[in-house]
């Protein structure tokens, strides 16, 4: 199997097969980061089987505006002692050659993804428990997922949608999340203060409180809209 064989259609079909295996008619889906694009695509391809979405520091497109925003947010941290090595690794076109090199790469760029780098050590056990695959990383680059831009189709999303983002996420930023919010009718936007790309790690109390409140609000709004139709 070649990396190019893995398409959004294939991933959406796999998700739907899992839904059927679980015996569920409709499912809520949550996607973090690039997985946000996957769950959005599922909602577009299988609207009758998607009950709602949680887009968590999610991405659905890349364009010049989002790239400029990311670069600006990166440069805001250029005086940090770890920045030069992290930025060099993040922008490098060279692919790690071994699993050890891949792990070193992840550890080098990780400070960029946190609001407070002290939280990296506090969450070390979570990162250690996360499976990493160099082959999967290479495959994701070769399948050119970044060329899939769902921006023009977001108006088609018609399920309850909660959009949550860390205030200092540089790669799936508040600007990007707000653009999603403006395109998805009836969606709710929540900002997790003092958090980066992993807000549930850095601000767990704030994150879970706001997400629970946000889910209740978006579901109540959906029921209200149905009743007044």
What are the residue ranges of the model-derived segments?
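Acidic catalytic loop of the alpha/beta-hydrolase fold
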Residues: 168-172
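Short beta-strand/loop motif that positions the catalytic acidic residue
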Residues: 157, 163-165
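Active-site loop/oxyanion-hole signature of alpha/beta-hydrolase fold enzymes
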Residues: 1-34, 209
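Short alpha-helix in the alpha/beta-hydrolase fold that links the catalytic acid
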Residues: 159, 173-182
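Conserved hydrolase catalytic core segment
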Residues: 25-69
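Alpha/beta-hydrolase
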Residues: 82-152, 159
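Flexible "cap/lid" loop of the alpha/beta hydrolase fold
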Residues: 53-93
